[in-house]
């Protein structure tokens, strides 16, 4: 099953906070520069001007992440994660081996949480600099309950949006772990064969609203340390920091994810403090966040039945927190008017398709569209691995869902942990697809920025979409169809400008995963604004099984 969303327009955002704090703990825009002799040379690599499809995962956690180490028992490292992506077997926290069933991935980013980056691993080290901290005993304990207490104590520090006091907020520990992360990413980068990205996750969750972003850097260099929620809970401050790095020569993108649990805050029609969106604000957001992760283990963030009632697949892999309340027999609870009683979070501002329309509405008001973004999928796997293969699913969070019993796949008499209600509903998903000239950091990063990208829930389906005014009727049958599509139009992610009353033509190409099932249909979801109100309509453009679009 494949669907495409065509909205020909643009938009974006800004803000900041001042804090009186120790200068050593302030966010820094200093950049770590590599020795030029160790940098990668791509001049000898072949390029395909018509671009190749590459698949990867830009959202993976290793033992540097607070929750992976203390809550899930994950000991697999950043280096192990890259080994997994290349097709090697690594250890699951439950002791068995995990590896990809299908082909190796083309690109990968280990994006550990900025908050307490490497700190828990240091607490667990009997010879480490934090070995005498009171929480070290909880983290080092063989009792999982103690580990969880340590996790809860650390996580509680992150809701304040304030610098963490030493020694837990040790800049030395953070910078050392971050520098190691950069070194390992660069060591595993093999231009033309396997691309790694320096990355981390900004993990702001004010009042339990998910405002997380993966931050991705394009080259061999990275900042001195990552900017996290301990620096600010406000993502607008993150954009300011990224802009400052950009002015010093270090580009980046931030990728929002799990907007489905943002309580409607991810894609608001106002600023974070409730102010009006201005053109400058909109441009800043678009500059820093040109793409969005719309599918992963914790469900889809594409759309919701309440937002797309005419879409029969709008409930695809919804997280249970977004599906609506159910009774003891699993039936949706409805109010006296017959409406589904929703959980918090299933709201306007929480889904990407709704945001595309909101951006068009904002453009009419302020002249700029801050939600003209592209889509990717990734996993958010916390085992230093990517569980996107449905028939080889090994869970997301180590010892919390690493067995069939813990995922509810087989019956058990054992008492299940409180997180069990979450693990029941997690999905094997997803992947990022890009169209790029070559498998290098530069080429893939540019594909991400121009949004010639797509999301899948795991299968390696190859999707292309073009728009233009001069496409011949037989373009789909032409042997040089892709070349003509580029020459006479614009690819997915681009802008097709209106030309009077001329009617555009669209060219869609999709091919199945060679190891997966056949495609059932291709759809285009059209969104538009009429008299200040947004609308969407779904079109079947190609069907199998003798169905007629």
Predicted features, each with a name:
Residues 1-6:
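Bacterial N-terminal signal peptides that target proteins for export
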Residues 216-218:
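Long, charge-dense tracts
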Residues 221-226, 294:
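Active-site gating/metal-coordination segments in enzymes
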Residues 135-162, 549:
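Low-complexity, serine/threonine/proline-enriched polar segments
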Residues 229, 237:
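Acidic, metal/ion-coordinating pockets
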Residues 14-16:
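C-terminal motif of bacterial Sec signal peptides marking the signal peptidase cleavage site
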Residues 221, 231-233:
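Conserved, charged catalytic cores of large soluble enzymes
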Residues 18-78, 82-85, 89-141, 167-170, ...:
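C-terminal functional module detector
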């Amino acid at each position: 099953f494949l669907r495409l969303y065509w909205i020909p327009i643009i938009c974006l955002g800004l803000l900041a906070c001042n804090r009186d704090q120790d200068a050593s703990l302030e966010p820094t825009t200093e950049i770590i520069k590599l020795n030029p002799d160790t940098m990668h040379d791509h001049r000898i690599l072949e390029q395909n001007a018509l671009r190749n499809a590459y698949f990867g995962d830009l959202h993976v956690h290793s033992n540097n992440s607070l929750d992976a180490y203390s809550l899930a028992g994950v000991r697999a490292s950043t280096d192990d994660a890259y080994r997994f992506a290349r097709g090697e077997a690594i250890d699951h926290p439950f002791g068995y081996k995990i590896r990809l069933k299908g082909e190796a991935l083309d690109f990968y980013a280990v994006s550990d949480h900025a908050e307490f980056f490497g700190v828990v691993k240091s607490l667990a080290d009997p010879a480490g600099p934090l070995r005498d901290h009171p929480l070290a005993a909880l983290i080092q304990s063989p009792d999982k309950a103690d580990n969880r207490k340590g996790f809860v104590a650390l996580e509680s520090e992150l809701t304040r949006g304030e610098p963490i006091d030493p020694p837990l907020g040790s800049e030395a520990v953070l910078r050392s772990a971050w520098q190691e992360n950069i070194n390992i990413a660069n060591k595993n980068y093999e231009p033309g064969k396997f691309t790694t990205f320096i990355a981390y996750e900004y993990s702001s969750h004010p009042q339990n609203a998910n405002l997380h972003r993966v931050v991705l850097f394009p080259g061999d260099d990275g900042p001195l340390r990552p900017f996290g929620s301990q620096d600010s809970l406000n993502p607008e401050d993150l954009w300011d920091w990224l802009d400052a790095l950009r002015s010093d020569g270090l580009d980046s993108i931030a990728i929002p994810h799990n907007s489905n649990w943002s309580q409607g805050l991810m894609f608001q029609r106002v600023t974070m403090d409730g102010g009006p969106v201005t053109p400058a604000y909109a441009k800043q957001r678009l500059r820093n966040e040109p793409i969005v992760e719309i599918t992963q283990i914790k469900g889809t963030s594409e759309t919701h039945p309440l937002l797309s009632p005419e879409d029969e697949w709008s409930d695809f892999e919804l997280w249970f927190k977004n599906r609506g309340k159910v009774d003891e027999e699993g039936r949706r609870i409805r109010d006296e008017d017959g409406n589904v009683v929703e959980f918090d979070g299933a709201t306007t501002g929480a889904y990407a398709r709704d945001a595309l329309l909101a951006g068009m509405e904002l453009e009419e008001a302020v002249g700029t569209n801050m939600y003209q973004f592209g889509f990717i999928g990734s996993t958010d796997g916390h085992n230093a691995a990517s569980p996107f293969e449905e028939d080889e699913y090994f869970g997301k969070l180590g010892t919390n869902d690493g067995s069939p019993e813990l995922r509810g796949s087989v019956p058990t008499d054992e008492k299940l942990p409180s997180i069990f209600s979450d693990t029941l509903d997690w999905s094997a998903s997803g992947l990022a697809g890009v169209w790029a000239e070559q498998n290098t950091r530069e080429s893939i990063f540019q594909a991400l920025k121009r949004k010639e990208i797509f999301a899948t829930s795991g299968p390696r389906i190859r999707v292309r979409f073009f728009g233009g005014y001069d496409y011949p009727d037989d373009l789909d049958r032409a042997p040089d169809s892709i070349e003509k599509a580029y020459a006479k139009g614009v690819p997915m992610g681009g802008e097709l400008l209106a030309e009077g009353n001329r009617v555009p033509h669209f060219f869609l190409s999709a091919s199945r995963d060679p190891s997966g099932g056949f495609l059932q249909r291709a759809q285009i979801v059209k969104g538009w604004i009429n008299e200040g109100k947004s609308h969407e309509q779904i079109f079947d453009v190609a069907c199998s099984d003798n169905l007629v679009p």
